Structure formats: C-alpha cells, structure tokens
C-alpha cells in the first residue's frame, strides 16, 4: 500500500484502473480514468483509455472503488470546538451555544476550529462542504484559509443578518457592500466558492432577505438560510409575520433556484408546493433531526415532487457513509414503515443525494459531484476487499448500508491526494489536534454559553440515569 500511496502522491497525470468506478449510471467494472490538471480528462473503458494514453503507466487498483467524494450540503466549520457540548440539549441550541461560542472566537481560534472541521470532513469522505457562514466578527478569511490549507472544496456563506444573530451587526448598506466584496473575492477561486447567507429569516429585515436572495441569484451563487426546523421558530414567524418561514420567503419573492434551505422539517403540503414551483432546494440533515430537531424532512416526498435536495451533516458527524444510512433509515422509520415501503428510495437515491444531488443544490453541478469528464477530480478510493462488501451483489445498497469512513484509503480534491487512510499526506494533523486540545477549553470558558443539562458525569452522579 505504501507503493500505491507514493504513486498517487505524484504531481503528474494519473491513469487509474480501479476494480469499479461509480459513474452517474451506477458502478462499472473495466473502466479507467485519467486525471490531468486537477480534472477528469478521460473516463472510458480501460481498453480505450490505455490506447489513447500510451505514455501513461496505468495504476492498477483491483480491490478499490473509485467514487465521487461526498458533498456536505450544510455544515458549520466554526462550530467544531463545541461539538461535544450539545448532546441532549433542547432545540435552538444556536441561541445558547453556537452564537455565543462563534461570536467569542478570535481569528486564530476560527482558523483552528475550521481546520479541525475541514479535516473531519475529508476523513469522512466529504471532498466538498457547504458552510453556512461564521458568526464571528470579521474572521471569514480565517475560515477560508483553513479550508484551503486542508484541501477541502468549500462553499462559504457570508452572513448578512441585519437584525441579530451575529457578533456584530453593521448597517444594511455596509452588509450589502461586504456581501458584494465577498462574491468578488472568491469568484474565480479554484477551491472556494462564495455564497450569501442569513442565519434564519427572523434575524433579517424583509428588505435584506429579498436583496440578498436577489444578489445571490444575479451572481449565480447560493443563498442559504435555516427554515422550519424548530416548532418555536415557526410559531414566532406566525406571530410576527402571519406566515410560516417558507411562506414568508415566498411572499417576499425570496425563493428561487438559487436558494438552499437547511432543514425544512416542519413543512406543510402548501410549502412543498412553493419549493417545487420556485425551484428552491433543501439540505436534508437526518442526523441533525435525530440529535436535536423536532421532525424529519419528508425527503421521499420531495424526491417524488421533483424538489431538489442534498444530504447535509449540519456539523453533527462527518461520515458520508453513515449520513446516507441515517438519511435512508429516518425515511424508513418516519414514513416507510407506516406505508409498507420496503425500498424508501433505494440505495441509488441516497448515493445520488450525497454526491451529485448535493453538488447540484450547492450550485456546483458543473464543478464536482460525479466521475465525469471535465469535472474536478474530487474522488475517493474505497477499499472493497473488506468483509462488509463480501459477497457483493448490489454495491449501491451496500455502500449505504455497510460503508464506513475507515474503508476510505484515499481522498482527492482537484486531482491532489489530500488524505491517505484517514491522515493528511502533506501536513501534521496530530500537531493540530494537540493545539486544539491545548486551547479549546480556554475558548469555551470565555464564551457565554448556556447549557440546559450538565455533562454526562454530572448527570450520573445526580441520579438522572443508572
């Protein structure tokens, strides 16, 4: 395996001949791919590729699947320092934990948090992550540097709240100028793709919601916001505006194909129709529903209606295989069992919405998400020589049900090997872990975090459980 790693780490062209390639139409044997200048320049039968590229020495990987990297349709890279503080907490943890924590981070801690989260993304097979924006003041550049240093492709949201929810609230005209500057700065970056965000509709004025959505649409980038996740937020919207959050966005004309709505779990049939009619997209975050949500998004119904959606972690757990398993499992538990639906979309649906479907909602359908000529060479080499994949009859289902991140041998973005068997090949990840362990406690202690429950040891001693 060390020989394979050495060959994959080179800077020249690669001709890879894996046992299987996961193409948009499904896994295929007897294929080969050529990676040149960071993109897939040829995907064809091994015979055709070797004939047309006689100068390249094929690298045989008979026990591996070459598949697209996962695309996390919704995450928060600057929340990794507090990720273990939210277990068992009631809804709207952003008010008590995330806003206070992120708002207290200085530039260095934003960098460390984002770098740690980006490393976790790559370890979990995510070659791309859609970040909803940091609430820290003026440190989005540190987040971008961290993601770039690790080699994670990222869609980075610039938060445009004008009524609250961040460390500092500039005037509306300043926010819009900063948003324009954000779009301009990263418009042609090879790994960083700009996006605009409003944390939740209630922390922005109607004028800002409409302006930011329109700006994103005109620029061809994604506008992100969280909607219909918690019952209390839906009720606040009804009281303040007379409409549910998605209904209010539709009323303002702020929905559209540029819009990516995180969660959309408490959603009515009318709101589903609004999403379908406007072409708006959803980040389906199944693990977030399990850990801290009020409901499960009706993803199968969205698929049947033609509503675009991709799978997101919401910063919960960076493992693309376990995310797919949770996505299918929650649809089965929440909807399939009651209707006798034994397929619940099938393995192919969840593979698609974790890769190309997620790239689509992220605004990156022409950039990544598939093994296809002209797209960025963002891919995984998954070891199929494992008990979990033996015997193999239906690889797409098997990846959803039996896949795990420890089966990923190599992670590539832009044609460059970033991780080998879970660890970076060109920087010291363990030094990062030591630095985070040394400084995270101080950062947490400084933040005005409010937890409702004590940590597990205190729970045990107080008699909450035996």
Residues of each region from the PLM?
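Active-site microenvironment of metallo-dependent hydrolases
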Residues: 1-31, 35-41, 52, 352-466
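Metal-coordinating catalytic core of metallo-dependent amide/deamination hydrolases
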Residues: 138-265, 270-272
């Amino acid at each position: 395996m060390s020989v394979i790693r050495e060959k994959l780490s080179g800077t020249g062209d690669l001709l890879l001949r894996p046992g299987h390639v996961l193409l948009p139409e499904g896994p295929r044997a007897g294929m080969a791919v050529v990676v040149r200048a960071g993109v897939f320049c040829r995907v064809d039968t091994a015979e055709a590729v070797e004939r047309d590229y006689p100068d390249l020495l094929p690298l045989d990987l008979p026990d591996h699947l070459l598949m697209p990297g996962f695309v996390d349709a919704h995450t928060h890279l600057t929340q990794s320092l507090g990720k273990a503080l939210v277990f068992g907490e009631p809804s709207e943890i952003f008010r008590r934990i995330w806003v206070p924590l992120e708002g207290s981070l200085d530039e260095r801690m934003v960098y460390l948090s984002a770098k740690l989260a980006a490393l976790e993304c790559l370890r979990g097979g995510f070659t791309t992550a859609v970040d909803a924006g940091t609430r820290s003041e003026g440190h989005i550049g540190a987040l971008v540097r961290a993601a770039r240093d690790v080699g994670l492709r990222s869609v980075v949201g610039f938060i445009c709240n004008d009524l609250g929810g961040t460390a500092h609230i500039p005037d509306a005209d300043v926010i819009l100028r900063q948003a324009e500057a954000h779009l301009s700065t990263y418009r042609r970056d090879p790994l960083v793709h700009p996006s605009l965000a409003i944390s939740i509709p209630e922390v922005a004025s109607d004028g800002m919601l409409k302006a930011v959505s329109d700006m994103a649409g005109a620029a061809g980038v994604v506008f992100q916001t969280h909607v219909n996740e918690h019952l209390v937020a839906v009720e606040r919207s009804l009281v303040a505006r007379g409409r549910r959050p998605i209904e209010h966005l539709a009323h303002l004309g702020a929905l559209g194909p540029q819009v990516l709505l995180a969660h959309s779990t408490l959603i009515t049939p009318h709101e589903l129709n609004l999403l379908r009619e406007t072409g708006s997209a959803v980040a389906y975050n199944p693990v977030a529903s399990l850990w801290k949500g009020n409901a499960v998004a009706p993803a199968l119904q969205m698929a049947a209606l033609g509503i675009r959606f991709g799978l997101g972690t919401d910063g919960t757990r960076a493992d693309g295989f376990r995310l797919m398993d949770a996505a299918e499992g929650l649809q089965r538990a929440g909807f399939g069992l009651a209707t006798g639906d034994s397929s619940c979309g099938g393995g192919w649906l969840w593979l698609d919405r974790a890769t190309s479907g997620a790239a689509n909602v992220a605004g990156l359908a022409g950039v990544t998400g598939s093994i296809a000529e002209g797209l960025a060479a963002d891919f995984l080499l998954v070891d199929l020589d494992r008990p979990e994949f033996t015997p193999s009859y239906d690889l797409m289902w098997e990846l959803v049900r039996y896949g795990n991140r420890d089966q990923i041998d190599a992670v590539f973005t832009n044609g460059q090997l970033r991780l080998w068997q879970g660890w970076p090949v060109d920087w010291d990840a363990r030094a990062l872990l030591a630095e985070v362990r040394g400084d995270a406690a101080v950062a947490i202690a400084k933040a005005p975090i409010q937890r409702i429950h004590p940590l597990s040891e205190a729970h045990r001693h107080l008699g909450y459980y035996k």
